[in-house]
Amino acid sequence: MEPDGTYEPGIVGIRFCQECNNMLYPKEDKENRILLYACRNCDYQQEADNSCIYVNKITHEVDELTQIIADVSQDPTLPRTEDHPCQKCGHKEAVFFQSHSARAEDAMRLYYVCTAPHCGHRWTE
């Protein structure tokens, strides 16, 4: 919550009743078609400054993304190497890419995917 009582866009915080300090819950005013926050213990309600009541941010780890993108080994834009053979099938060629992870320890980690059609093994070094 900002000092002026408003909320940062995209941030959905817990709001509390100004009269009895209980939690406020989202409620629709069907007649005026607006979102309200209402107390379930007293009659206090306030108009919502934002129509968003829930934010679900999904972040994927690089390991998950290589599983989701099955064709990563066929991507012509990814660099290829023969210096890191597949540990699973022995195939010499692999595509590689750098992690875009927000974690500092993963900042320079390279991920490899075997280009053999029957394999698709993923690893990092």
UniProtKB/Swiss-Prot annotation:
Keywords: Acetylation, DNA-directed RNA polymerase, Metal-binding, Nucleus, Transcription, Zinc, Zinc-finger. Belongs to the archaeal RpoM/eukaryotic RPA12/RPB9/RPC11 RNA polymerase family. One of its GO terms (biological process) is transcription initiation at RNA polymerase II promoter. A zinc finger (C4-type) spans 17-42. The modification N-acetylmethionine is found at residue 1. Zn(2+) 1 binds at residues 17, 20, 39, 42. DNA-dependent RNA polymerase catalyzes the transcription of DNA into RNA using the four ribonucleoside triphosphates as substrates. Component of RNA polymerase II which synthesizes mRNA precursors and many functional non-coding RNAs. Pol II is the central component of the basal RNA polymerase II transcription machinery. It is composed of mobile elements that move relative to each other. POLR2I/RPB9 is part of the upper jaw surrounding the central large cleft and thought to grab the incoming DNA template. Coiled coil: none annotated. A zinc finger (TFIIS-type) spans 82-124. It comes from Bos taurus (Bovine). Component of the RNA polymerase II (Pol II) core complex consisting of 12 subunits: a ten-subunit catalytic core composed of POLR2A/RPB1, POLR2B/RPB2, POLR2C/RPB3, POLR2I/RPB9, POLR2J/RPB11, POLR2E/RPABC1, POLR2F/RPABC2, POLR2H/RPABC3, POLR2K/RPABC4 and POLR2L/RPABC5 and a mobile stalk composed of two subunits POLR2D/RPB4 and POLR2G/RPB7, protruding from the core and functioning primarily in transcription initiation. Part of Pol II(G) complex, in which Pol II core associates with an additional subunit POLR2M; unlike conventional Pol II, Pol II(G) functions as a transcriptional repressor. Zn(2+) 2 binds at residues 86, 89, 114, 119. One of its GO terms (cellular component) is RNA polymerase II, core complex. Its main location: nucleus. GO terms for molecular function: DNA-directed RNA polymerase activity; nucleic acid binding; zinc ion binding. This is DNA-directed RNA polymerase II subunit RPB9.
